[in-house]
Every structure is written in structure tokens, then in C-alpha cells.
Amino acid sequence: YNPFNGKYLIEEYDIRVVNSARDFIQNKEKEQIQYTINTAVLFGYPNFDGNSSFSSDTAVLFALNRDLSSFWIDSLTRGGLKVNPLPGTKKEINNISHTLNSNGWNINSYTENDATESNLKKISSPRVLHIASHGYFFSDIPQTTENNRFLGMDRNQVIQDPMLRSGLIFAGANRTLRGEKSTGENGLLSAAEASLLDLRETELVILSACETGRGEETNSEGVYGLRKAFLDAGAQNIIMSLWKVDDNVTQEFMSRFYEIWLHDKTTIREAFNRTQLDIKEKYPQPYYWGAFLLIEK
């Protein structure tokens, strides 16, 4: 914010964010990818309570004690005491799907019981990957004397690896948090897992979830967390958030971004900057528009 003229930086400068100084240097040398097939994969409105892979007679993958479950539930939501549905993301996915379809894109949408971690891991380099769900980041691991496990792993391992302390939440996650047993994925995608996705030819990843842009800073590699994970997986650009944002405003932001990018045929950065300014006109407080971040590789 510039106190001399009452304007914010985004109103005066074309701001560019990279994950690290190394990425900034490498970006000058990289060749631009030519995208010939417009494909998009959309995830949203997961059914956090439902997933057919859960059963009562299989091994426990993620056994959480009551104290840790309470900590998770409080930390993973946008404002409640449990992982609640995100009705705004259903409208968000529908609107984006309509916009993409009207511009000739091939779309695969996964919602409710289909918005699973396992379906995400099957994707292969779509041009756009959009995930509208809860995100999380643990800056501090809660202490407990009951056992030395956190998220089913040795606590010391989690503390030492920040890639295990941030992630996204998919269908069935509540059942994992309650300590139920699973035959497959648990609905909790860590940054470490996200880094293994096949996004080698993906132009844009949008993480429409709270706190997805946070991570642990290091001297040489920028921020360890979901932003680093998706860049490592191959994504060229990432749009994510730094704090909890109103569901409806998030939906408006994302829908407006796609409209500008596809209809006006702008660059991703120009579409993002214009979207921020448009949202700022309707919601002047930085809380609403300042949370969103574009990271370029």
C-alpha cells in the first residue's frame, strides 16, 4: 500500500512472483511450451464423509487419537469445527466447466464421491488442473504424551519434513480423521504426494482452497509446501491462496479469471492481475482479493 497516493501496489505495478531466485534465473532461459490440446481436469465439492474404499476389516492407514483429530478438524476448516462441505465449490466447478466448454475445451470433472485422492493421482498432464477444496498447513505440530504418531507417521519425521505438513483434502477424509479403516487412499493428499503427480505439460494449476500458498521457508528453495510440490510435479503456473477466504468470493474470483483468460485470450498473469482489480472494485478490503497468489515457474 502506498500511503502517498492511497493506491495498492497491484494498481501501480505488474508484480511477478516466483518460488525462488533460482526459478527466476531459469525462467529467462526456458522455452515456451506450445499447447495444442485444451484439456482441463476439475475437482471440487468433495464428499468428505463418503468414500467406498472404507471398510471395517482392513488395516488402519491413519489412526489418529482424539486430541490430534480435534487439532486437525480445527485446522483444516475455513471457519468451523469440522471439515464441512464447501457448497460454493460446487457452483465454482459448474461455472468453470461451462466457461471452458463454451471455449471448446475437453473437460473431466470430479465432484462429491468422485473427488477422490486416487482419481487425482491418475491424471496425466492436463493443460489445466483446478482443485476446489480445503487446504491445510501445520506450522507447529501439536504435542501429546499419548503416543509418538502424527498422521500415522513418526512424529519426528513429520517435524523434519515440511512437505508432510501441508496438503489438500479429498472425499472420505473425515472418515480417516475419525480413525476409520481404509483399503486405499485416505483422502489427505500431502505436498510430498502432490510432488509425484504427472504435470509435466500442465500450464496452470489452480488450488482454490485456504492456506494452500503457505509453507516453510528455506534459504535455497523458496517455500516448501504445496506451491513447491506442484512446481516440482511440472506445473508452469500456480494460483493459490495465503489465508482463509470467503467461499463465495473465491468462487467469483475463479470464475472471473477464466472468463478473462479464455474470452480475451490474455496471458495467465494479465488475466490474474485484471481479476484481482475487478474483485477489488466489488470487495475493497485486501482480505478478499489479496489472499490470491500467482506463482510462475
For every predicted segment, state its role.
Residues 1-297:
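Catalytic cores of enzymes
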